[in-house]
Swiss-Prot record:
SUPFAM superfamilies: Ribosomal L27 protein-like (SSF110324). HAMAP family: Ribosomal_bL27 (MF_00539). This is Large ribosomal subunit protein bL27. The keyword GTP-binding does not apply. It comes from Mycobacterium leprae (strain TN).
Amino acid sequence: MAHKKGASSSRNGRDSAAQRLGVKRFGGQVVKAGEILVRQRGTKFHPGVNVGRGGDDTLFATSAGAVEFGVKRGRKTVNIVAVGLTAD
């Protein structure tokens, strides 16, 4: 049986859906525990204080607070800092 298809057929024409990676919460934004901060492949950003890392390297907040980006030992890190409540 021939392995060539008939005329006017193509094996192309498919494309994969985008993975929607990137920073989801930016510096200074207030987040709740469990919110996703960064979707990534590999550790482009490393988890810092109050930040966890999922099995697919996603960074998420482990407590409520404000997002803070920084550098520690030459690595980009993401931290969650407590937001001070002001009494008016």
